[in-house]
């Protein structure tokens, strides 16, 4: 098809990568150096480690327009009282999540996709809330794809540790303290019917009850991946998250991956996704083209090996944003 208009200076929304065209994204990196949700220190350096691993340059090499929005202001644990023993630093974490949510909304209002770097997983109560709020203002809703070794479905009442990084998914589905669950004044942010949890292999007894109470059924354990394969699990999960929604928020906890490939995480669990399974999951996300916001959390360079986990995080981000083998 020809067009008489002069398009010599136009920017195409697609780039050619191999046999398929991939959309070009305007991406804003948002760092959240939060570690108060975890008991093991060091994950606050995760955003820097992922940046040092070349995230911005690698995404730009794929043709994306990338800007770095810097870091969200986060309180330092050593200067704060931990407060409630059933939810350590809850007040400070809730404030950080609110700031993160507002930054995500602003990013999306400016036509960019948020790429949030953690930090511990408690920040996701903010990032996913921001994405949900952006679409709520448009009369739409989103789903969520949650890659994690853990369910993150505790509340202060069910938690055995009081670590808030074990609570964000429950908060997004309306369970738990208002400071996490009711950012922007309402809950839930995500419907259970549009939520998919992938790769879980360590669930507390209280979380099982919370999952039943919330009506969450799309929980894919590592056994499901072993028996059915990553593609079948991903296709079903994306159908769940995409049903009647404008797309989905993707939350990637690096402990979802087996610690042989991702050693630099605070709560490693043996038997996770392999290197190639993780890449395949990200590649399928890119193929579907419905990802609306993305985050990588729980990279802990203090316990990493030569920045291997941060390097892998960058590789997986590239796959999620369209990098192909051929």
Identify the function of each model-found stretch.
Residues 154, 203-205, 301-303:
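Active-site environment of divalent metal-dependent phosphoester hydrolases
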Residues 176, 196-204, 232-234, 274-279:
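A general structural motif
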Residues 189-193, 214, 243-245:
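Short gly/pro-enriched beta-turn/loop segments at secondary-structure junctions
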């Amino acid at each position: 098809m020809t067009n008489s208009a002069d398009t010599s200076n136009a920017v195409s929304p697609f780039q050619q990568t191999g046999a398929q065209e991939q959309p070009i994204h305007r991406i804003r990196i948002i760092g959240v150096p939060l570690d108060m949700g975890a008991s093991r220190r060091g994950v606050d350096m995760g955003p820097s480690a992922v940046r040092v691993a070349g995230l911005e340059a690698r995404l730009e090499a794929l043709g994306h327009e990338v800007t770095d929005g810097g870091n969200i202001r986060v309180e330092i644990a050593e200067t704060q009282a931990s407060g409630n023993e059933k939810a350590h630093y809850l007040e400070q974490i809730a404030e950080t999540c609110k700031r993160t949510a507002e930054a995500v909304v602003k990013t999306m209002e400016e036509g960019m996709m948020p790429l949030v770097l953690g930090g511990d997983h408690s920040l996701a109560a903010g990032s996913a809330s921001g994405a949900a709020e952006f679409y709520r203002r448009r009369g739409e809703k989103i789903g969520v794809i949650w890659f994690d070794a853990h369910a993150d479905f505790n509340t202060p009442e069910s938690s055995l540790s009081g670590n808030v990084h074990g609570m964000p998914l429950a908060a997004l589905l309306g369970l738990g303290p208002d400071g996490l669950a009711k950012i922007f004044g309402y809950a839930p942010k995500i419907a259970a019917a549009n939520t998919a949890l992938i790769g879980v292999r360590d669930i507390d007894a209280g979380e099982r009850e919370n999952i039943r109470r919330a009506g969450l059924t799309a929980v894919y354990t590592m056994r499901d991946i072993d028996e059915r394969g990553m593609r079948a699990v991903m296709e079903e999960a994306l159908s769940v998250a995409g049903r009647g929604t404008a797309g989905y928020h993707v939350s990637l906890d690096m402990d979802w991956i087996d610690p042989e490939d991702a050693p630099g995480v605070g709560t490693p669990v043996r038997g996770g996704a392999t290197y190639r399974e993780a890449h395949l999951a990200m590649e399928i996300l890119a193929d579907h083209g419905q990802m609306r916001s993305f985050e990588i959390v729980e990279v802990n360079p203090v316990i990493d090996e030569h920045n291997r986990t941060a390097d892998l995080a960058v590789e997986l981000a590239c796959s999620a944003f369209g990098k192909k083998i051929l």
